Amino acid sequence: ERNLELSDFHTMCERVRTMNKVTIAQIEGRVGGGGSEFAASMDMRFGVIGKTIVNQMEVPLGILPGGSGTQRLPRLVGRGRAMEIVLGADDLDAETAERWGYLNRIYGAEQIDAKVAALAERISRFPVAAVRLAKASVNASDLPIQQGLQEEAYLFARLLRTEAAQHNMSQFLQNGGQTREGELRVGELSAQLGKAD
């Protein structure tokens, strides 16, 4: 009999995926089964070269990934690769997981802490409302394209009127963001903008 309620694990993963905070998984070893499904619910995943291994081992046990793996993996890596991960139940090394899109990036063991912390710190300096609504807009990509575009336009218009947006856009222009030289270092200029909300 089909249960229309989400399981507790599904509910937890959806709360992580849709919460208004940024979630980052730093995977420094093996992640499989429910752990892989939980990590796939995060906004970003980072691994260690030669150490991170991803696996969905359920099918050989006579079951299937029941914690959101059959739904999240195709969205991350595509249908064919998701089939290979789920049906093949073989270890996916860090390099392949990055190339396929399960991991955002991979780093050496001596680099990962600093790299992930730097990204988290960078994001934490940006206006909170912009981070939250940008995440909500990306999550709206699960909607049909017309609805997703409408949601993006609505959220963009909401943010455009905020004090933080007005302040940071003005600061960006004052720092030369509209110049040819500024365009060549837009990442650096963006990092100089702080919270105004």
Show which residues each predicted segment covers.
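C-terminal alpha-helix plus adjacent terminal tail
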Residues: 89-94, 114, 121, 125-197
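Hydrophobic alpha-helical segments typical of transmembrane helices
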Residues: 8, 12, 69-72, 81, ...
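An acidic, glycine-rich surface segment that forms the CoA-thioester-binding/catalytic face
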Residues: 1-28, 188-197
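Short C-terminal domain-edge/linker segments immediately following a structured domain
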Residues: 2-6, 56-58, 76-79, 138, ...
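Crotonase-fold acyl-CoA enzyme core
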Residues: 14-129
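Hydrophobic alpha-helical membrane-association signature
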Residues: 5-8, 38, 112, 152
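Residues at secondary-structure transition points
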Residues: 3-7, 49, 64, 147
